[in-house]
């Protein structure tokens, strides 16, 4: 997976991401309200990830639905009754990606999926389940966080119109603005870890096997 996300490889994706972004933006109405989340933010990351993997455009809605269903149940506080739906989505998405692996082995191309398959040839210890786990992680971690960052970032600018005006006057500030959005309105505010050995934090003794939630969102605002 790392070989597909080197700085050089990531830069090569820039044109494709810009093209996908511009295509979606061109479809938005210029003189009437539209749903930014539904018509842009929710579509863009799934399209980019699918393009990276070489997944058929006609399957985008289904892969997004699976990703959404799985993501809902792994939240720190998940609503009851979602587990069965999430488990079914996990099975269906896994089988879909397994079929994609078989298809790509029979008909290789030049995508991230092919890079992973080639990596498996170089390291036979990697099983198909390992590849599928990485593909699932890419979908789950990649599409939801990007969607939420786009939505949170736009909302922050609407709440601070003077900052939006600064960006309009000087687009060169955009890289710094994106970094600040990641801090100020991060789409990921919790990191989960399980202790492997006894640990002590202040007066608190934490035994092995304990699930911890690290609130990075709080650290970003230095409470």
Label every PLM stretch briefly.
Residues 2-223:
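Cytochrome P450
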């Amino acid at each position: 997976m790392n070989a597909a996300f080197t700085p050089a490889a990531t830069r090569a994706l820039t044109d494709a991401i810009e093209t996908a972004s511009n295509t979606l933006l061109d479809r938005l109405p210029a003189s009437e309200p539209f749903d930014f989340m539904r018509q842009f933010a929710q579509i863009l990351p799934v399209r980019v990830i699918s393009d990276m993997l070489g997944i058929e455009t006609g399957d985008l809605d289904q892969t997004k639905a699976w990703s959404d269903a799985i993501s809902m149940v792994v939240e720190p506080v998940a609503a009851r009754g979602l587990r069965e739906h999430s488990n079914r989505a996990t099975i269906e998405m896994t089988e879909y990606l397994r079929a994609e692996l078989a298809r790509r082995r029979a008909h290789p191309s030049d995508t991230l999926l092919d890079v992973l398959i080639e990596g498996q040839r170089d390291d036979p210890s990697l099983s198909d389940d390992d590849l599928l786990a990485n593909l699932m992680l890419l979908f789950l971690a990649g599409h939801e966080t990007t969607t939420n960052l786009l939505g949170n970032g736009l909302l922050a600018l609407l709440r601070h119109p003077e900052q939006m005006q600064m960006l309009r006057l000087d687009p060169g500030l955009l890289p710094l603005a994106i970094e600040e959005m990641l801090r100020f309105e991060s789409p990921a505010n919790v990191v989960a870890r399980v202790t492997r050995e006894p640990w002590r934090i202040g007066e608190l003794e934490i035994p092995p096997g304990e699930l911890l939630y690290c609130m990075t969102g709080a650290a970003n605002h230095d409470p």
